[in-house]
Each structure stands twice: as structure tokens, then as C-alpha cells.
Amino acid sequence: MILETARLRLREMEDGDFPALCRMLQDPVVMYAYEHAFSDQEAWDWLHNQQRRYSRDGFGLWAVVEKATGEMVGQCGITWQSVGDDRQMPEVGYLLERAAWHKGYATEAAQACRDYAFDTLGFQEVCSIIRDNNLPSQAVARRNGMTPRGTLVKHYYGMDMPHLIFTVRRTELEKEKWNGVADSAIDKQ
């Protein structure tokens, strides 16, 4: 296990997670931001790419497992992503199966991954790169303390897909935390 939250466990994906991964990656509603549901081969490639990331980088997209059921309901984690001009940045990415939507799981997992990126991996800034039409994921990024700071266009299956680059810096979260402590102290006076 990599991370644990109140309701979720995040762990490395295993080959046995393939059926659960397919529930997400082959669902056209879940994959609307990609404009393409994955084939079996694409889903296997996705799974094995995460496993290569674990070995190479020490992180990747992890299986999101619901504690109450023990079922894999999504993926969330940290990956290196291009943000233009040959610049790479750690990204907090998330994707959940439809049955896990509207439960706060994406925010819960994304916040845990953001904190892991800062506190364990030592990154000073993380991003989430989100399609311009993916409002639910943008809302998760905002709840994760992120603000849009740039744009890029990804080319996927012959299509140009505009994306927003949401970021948060460690110092911004620390400042927000201290402001909350100060506000709490003032409220008690």
C-alpha cells in the first residue's frame, strides 16, 4: 500500500486489476475527455505503463481501492507530464469508474497524492492537466488547491484537444494552512 485515506487505499496496480481497469478505460462515458474508450490491448498497455513507472520513477497512477468493499474503483497518482517547452512536471492524475462518482473519492485521493508529492517525494509544485471541457475534473483540481496557470493542446488520435494546466505550489498550501491557523486563533479571542 502506498497511501491510505479515511475511505480509500492507494496501491500499485497489478495484472489482476485488469478487469477493474477495463470498467473505467472501456466506458465511453468515463473516457469522454479522451474522446476514445480503450481496447483490451490499450488497457493492458496502460496497466503495464504504470508498472514501468513504478520501477523507473518510484510512482505512477495507483489503484484506488474502496476500504469498505475492497474493490478497485479508480486510479490516482503522480506521473511526469510535459507542460510545454520540453518542461516536465509531476502531475496528480485521477480517473474513477462511474459507480464511484459524486462520493468525493477523486478529491480525497488527489489531495492524498498532492500531499505525498510534497511531503514524501519533495516536489515543490504539482499540476493537473485537464481538458478544457472536463468541468468535474477541474472542480477536483480547485478543491486540491490548484488554479489554472497555462494551456496546452494535446494531439490524440488525430484530434487537437485543448487542456488547462492547473498547478499548486507547496508554499501556497503552507501559506493557506498558516492563514487558517491564524484565523482560528483570532476566532478564539
Where are the language model's segments positioned?
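Conserved GNAT-fold acetyl-CoA-binding loop/helix
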Residues: 29-49, 60
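Acyl-donor (CoA/ACP) binding surface of acyl/acetyltransferases
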Residues: 1-33, 65-189
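Short, P/G- and charge-enriched loop/turn segments at secondary-structure junctions
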Residues: 49-51, 152-153
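Short loop/turn motifs at secondary-structure junctions and domain boundaries
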Residues: 53-58
